[in-house]
Amino acid sequence: PPPAHNPLYLSSAASDVYKRQAYNAALPILTEYGTELSQNARLQQAYARVDGGLPADASEARRNAVAHALRDFHLAGVDLPEHEKQRFREIMQSLAAIQADFDHRIQDASDAWALPVDDADELEGLSTQVLQRAAAEASRRGREGWLLTLDYPTYHAVMTHAENRGLRETFYHGWVTRASDQGANAEWDNSDNIDRILALRHEAANLVGFRNYAEYSLATKMAESPEQVIEFLRDLASHSRLAAEAELAELRDFSGMVVEPWDVSFLLEKLKQEKFSISNEALRQYFPATMVVSGLFELASRLYDVEFASDPDVVTWHEDALYYRVRNRGGEEIGGFYTDLFARSGKRTGAWVDDCVNRKNLNGSATLPVGFLVCNFSPPDERGQSLLTHDDVVTVFHEFGH
């Protein structure tokens, strides 16, 4: 199959020094290509001719496709004098590099954070799965006891289940101060990057006729103005505040203490268990990752009349990543799909779906499309089994839906 080894994808899913170098080398080339394509006056004129020649009965989708393309040419500065076009291109190059560095600093700050623990009592409430992973990480780094890292499964487990309030507070501060001037590692402070991104976005927006970046951003969205967005958010907050305050009061009454941010997830889990006798950890046994993926593909097969077949011979970027050939009921291969489900060092947090090979080549010929699903679930235990929470299952199905 067409490999998903492009540097932009691997920078998020399997970053190391070599892949990051490849990413940094490819980024300015791709940025230059994208900007020059968007500023190509001949291409814009071709779209304008298509727009002028649309028949009266052209579909709304067709009209919108052309209108959006023409809009995007304008947003890229196609109408500007040459010296301003050049400045816009320079800004796009700078933004691409700074935003990449912003992401890398968050990743590096997250990977560098670790908390050694020698007393098992400090880890009360954490599952066997989390403890085994922490013990293995300590052993890997030549330490005794446990080493808790800031990968999302560990962070979520501590914030939701750790009885040790001080441990939860430590993790909370570690998470929210990553790559900041208040974080544990000043070398990855992103404050300057934020200032530079804001300034460059503002300048780019001004160049193409907007007062600020907020207006520029909304040119491709449903909201008509920044003021409309702020009004919507304030209205939403006014309707949500009473309910939120009532729920917070319930947590205070339930716990008998002043509720801090690092207490909320923990107390919500305790309250849910008391009121409804439901435990997210207890539900894990029903959701082995392999069974969830199998069920996902079975549902897709019923809905779309396709089949997914794992191909272990395909070389991937990590042993956790698997490749599936997608075939129709007649056995014809119609695409491919990668899954990369488990958290690890060098991998961006979160969950996302994207394509790495499009359906058509630039010359218009068809090729097999390939997509990928990336998540950050708890890695398999010593038995090779990863048990998901119900929220994890929802995440898998949500992302696959894209």
List each language-model region with its residue ranges.
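Single conserved hydrophobic/aromatic residue that forms the stacking wall/gate
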Residues: 1-14, 18
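Aromatic/His-enriched, Gly/Pro-containing loop or helix-boundary segments
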Residues: 58, 69-74, 185-186, 355-367, ...
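Short small-residue beta-strand/loop micro-motif enriched in glycine and branched aliphatics
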Residues: 157-158, 225-226, 381-385
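His/Asp/Glu-rich acidic catalytic environments and adjacent acidic regulatory segments
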Residues: 21-224, 239, 319-321
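Alpha-helix N-cap/helix-initiation motif
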Residues: 3, 7, 186, 190, ...
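Active-site-proximal, well-structured secondary-structure segments within enzyme catalytic domains
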Residues: 65, 94-97, 104, 108-149, ...
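Short histidine-centered catalytic/ligand-binding loop motif
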Residues: 160, 170, 281-288, 386
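Active-site recognition of the HExxH zinc-binding catalytic motif
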Residues: 391-402
